[in-house]
Regions:
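GST-like domain detector, emphasizing the conserved glutathione-binding G-site
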Residues: 1-141, 192, 212, 269-342
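A non-catalytic, amphipathic alpha-helix used as a structural packing/dimerization or gating element
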Residues: 92-100, 170-177, 181, 228-231
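Alpha-helical scaffold segments in carbohydrate-active enzymes
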Residues: 96-106, 181, 205-210, 235-238
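Divalent-metal (Mg2+/Mn2+/Ca2+)-assisted nucleotide/phosphate chemistry catalytic cores
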Residues: 122-172
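Short N-terminal edge-element motif at the start of the domain
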Residues: 159-194
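Active-site segments that bind and position negatively charged phosphate/pyrophosphate groups
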Residues: 189, 194-198, 233, 239
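GST superfamily/GST-like fold recognition
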Residues: 192-212
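Active-site/pore-lining binding-face segments in mid-to-C-terminal subdomains
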Residues: 205-296
Length: 342
């Protein structure tokens, strides 16, 4: 029997999306080859935009192509490899999985970026360690200089995620509420949508590898406030031994209240941001101005997140009338109904 060729990807441990996809590959039992790098790699094609992780898949001509964006890659792997899929078979439950993955990738990452570059202890940890993952065999002086360069590049980008003196407390309060809701959910359920992990779990895991396991300020908060969540991150790192079944997903007519509580946090903070950002992008505005959790929110428009909203609406539109009715009821209960409004 011929061994399957390993999937090649490039990434670093400090990238939440790299960690998301590595955990996914382990759970899927898909062989892979990780190149520990953050920049162009000799012998491999360059991506249009240098994002981590970068996957290298054979193109139609057999030549490798550089592919980025974790969510489409997750779906591609589900389409190409039938065993141990992470997308629920029920299209309505799959929609909820998409929403949770999107929330993790696009909102929880605000907490990750905010904590990493807003507090001195976290800035020092990141500046000291991030460059050492790819440039460890160098002098202390050069490593310190690399850390200063990374911090100097990343701290000004806080404005892109909406982190400032006004919005910082909103981000932190939202992270605390998410921890409380997820901690309560984990008392009875091992994963967001049942007894097997979905894309949303891997999205949340990716962000928590940094928030709960690397950056000192949110790490301390997580360990103290949500010990089950803290432990969950360590467990999800490698789920290759889990044996899932088709019956492990929640049924749409039996969603637990603890999941609704998590979705309410999505409706409270992420839904208004997605909607305001989409309006700003459509209008060609120079900044997003809205209110989130009773506080003013200002950030630069993000065209990618406008696409995220469009993709969610496309997925909802593809459901049959009964499935749409079920999703509409769940989202209304959670305060997310505006996401699917025409």
């Amino acid at each position: 029997m011929t061994e399957p060729s390993p999937i090649t990807l490039k990434g670093v441990p400090g990238s939440p999306y790299t960690r998301k996809m590595l955990a996914l590959l382990r759970y899927r039992r898909l062989p892979y080859r990780l190149i520990l790098a953050s920049h162009d790699t000799p012998g491999l094609p360059a991506a249009k935009v240098n994002l981590l992780p970068t996957f290298y898949f054979p193109g139609p001509d057999g030549e490798l192509q550089a592919v980025t964006d974790s969510s489409p890659i997750l779906r591609r792997l589900d389409a190409e490899h039938a065993a141990r899929r992470v997308r629920p078979a029920d299209p309505a439950v799959a929609f909820l999985d998409s929403l949770l993955e999107d929330y993790a990738d696009e909102w929880l990452t605000k907490a990750m970026f905010h904590y990493r570059w807003a507090y001195e202890a976290d800035i020092k940890r990141a500046s000291d360690v991030l460059p050492a993952w790819t440039r460890g065999r160098t002098s202390d002086a050069l490593l310190a200089e690399a850390g200063k360069t990374i911090a100097g590049r990343q701290i000004p980008r806080l404005r892109y995620v909406g982190s400032n003196e006004v919005t910082g407390p909103v981000i932190e309060a939202s992270y605390a509420r998410f921890l409380d809701a997820f901690e309560a959910h984990l008392r009875d359920h091992p994963f967001l949508l049942g007894a097997r992990p979905g894309g949303g779990d891997f999205g949340v895991f990716g962000q928590l590898t940094q928030l709960a396991m690397f950056d000192p300020t949110p790490m301390a908060i997580t360990a103290q406030r949500a010990p089950r969540v803290f432990a969950w991150v360590g467990a999800v790192e490698d789920l290759s031994g889990l044996e899932p079944s088709d019956a492990d997903w929640f049924a749409m007519d039996a969603l637990p209240a603890t999941l609704t509580a998590i979705l309410k946090e999505v409706g409270r903070v992420y839904a208004p941001l997605l909607l305001a950002n989409a309006r700003a992008v459509k209008a060609g505005a120079t900044q997003v101005e809205t209110e989130i959790d009773g506080q003013p929110w200002v950030q630069q428009p993000f065209p990618y997140q406008a696409k995220c909203l469009a993709w969610l609406r496309e997925e909802y539109s593809a459901l049959n009338p009964g499935q749409r009715a079920g999703i509409s009821e769940v989202l209304t209960d959670a305060g997310c109904e505006a996401l699917i409004a025409a």
